[in-house]
Amino acid sequence: MLSPKKVKYRKKQRGRLSGEAQKGNKISFGEYGLVSLETNFITARQIEAARIAMTRKIKRGGRVWIRIFPDIPYTKKPAETRMGKGKGGVDHWNAPVKLGTVMFEMSGVVEELAQEAMSLASSKLPVKTMFVVRRDLR
């Protein structure tokens, strides 16, 4: 699963996401993309599940790019632990996804197959998504 190799600070405050994506909102590498229609955090496990679903569908043809990276730590205290004694340990890593973010890109396959693969990936994610083709975003 994806996670940072090294971070300046191990733990971070939660924070909130708002607004639309200013960066990462255009298809840069592939012909097809999966764009977020909502704002949310996506875990490294969800990204990996979506990647596996796509690559299994397209088999050997084509190439997949993951355009989001989980670099925000999510901490959690163990179950049945009393409050206090400091902040919990890092449980998993999240990727911030804003409205309009291109999360995955694909090329080297026909459009129908790409759409099916992206649909499978979309079902693994906690946000509503839209399949886009590079010619649509010009």
UniProtKB/Swiss-Prot annotation:
One of its GO terms (biological process) is translation. Residues 1-15 have a biased composition (Basic residues). The keyword tRNA-binding applies. Residues 1-21 are annotated as: Disordered. The keyword tRNA-binding applies. One of its GO terms (molecular function) is tRNA binding. Keywords: Ribonucleoprotein, Ribosomal protein, RNA-binding, rRNA-binding, tRNA-binding. It comes from the Bacteria. One of its GO terms (cellular component) is cytosolic large ribosomal subunit. Pfam families: Ribosomal_L16. NCBIfam families: rplP_bact. Binds 23S rRNA and is also seen to make contacts with the A and possibly P site tRNAs. Part of the 50S ribosomal subunit. Belongs to the universal ribosomal protein uL16 family. HAMAP family: Ribosomal_uL16. This is Large ribosomal subunit protein uL16.
